[in-house]
């Protein structure tokens, strides 16, 4: 089972984006995920980590929920 963290910038108003990613991951992988944790941050951060590996960082990647789900998939081992 996998723990996923979605770290988002609170002052930047990225909560909705973090919730969208969390919802998409839970809908796609369901019980194959141990937990999806929303982690508050600042300084424009928006990153997704699966099993302690960064799979998305907005400083390096363009925001795309489907791409984030695909990046998480190898860590979950679920069939989608």
Please place each PLM-identified region on the residue numbering.
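Local sequence-structure signature of Cys/Sec-based thiol-disulfide redox active-site neighborhoods
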Residues: 1-30, 38
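A short, hydrophobic beta-strand/beta-hairpin element that forms part of a small beta-sheet core
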Residues: 46-54
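Short edge beta-strands and adjacent turn/loop segments
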Residues: 34-47
